[in-house]
Amino acid sequence: MTTKFLYWHWEEFYDKKQIKTIHDLIQDKSYTKEDPDLAASPYEDGTPRKVVDTQLVNYREIEYAIRGIIDEAYTICLTQFGYTAKLPTNDDLHYNTYTSRKKSRYDYHIDEARENTHDYKLTLLINLSPKEYEGGDFYLFSSGNMMIPELKKPGSAI
């Protein structure tokens, strides 16, 4: 299937109240922090690509709060990109918190599985920041870097 889109976006899918509800739910239901050794592979010199606080939360625990965007993403995944995808309900979601104080960043990387039995076909990013921020631009690489401005708005998703 040929697609005319590199990505899809939903601007301000969640309002400030919903963002706070989801954030609070993740704080309550998160069960651990991501092991840095299991995060994105470091650069050849050992410098980490990912310097971010990442909490893990089971999808089942917050499904009711994010079901709307998940359903939208499944529909777009099928109708616009030609993939039939279904998130296993026992999968973990990553909640990344970026701060200027810690000089957080997640450098260029490719989303792929470490195992040969499966690979990622769909990544959904939701901006759950309670307010607008500077920096932290998100780029896709497709014949050159392309900034995705829609993700800057709180409550938006790509």
Residue ranges and their predicted role:
Residues 1-86:
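Non-heme Fe(II)/2-oxoglutarate
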Residues 67-71, 75-158:
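Catalytic core of non-heme Fe(II) oxygenases with the double-stranded beta-helix
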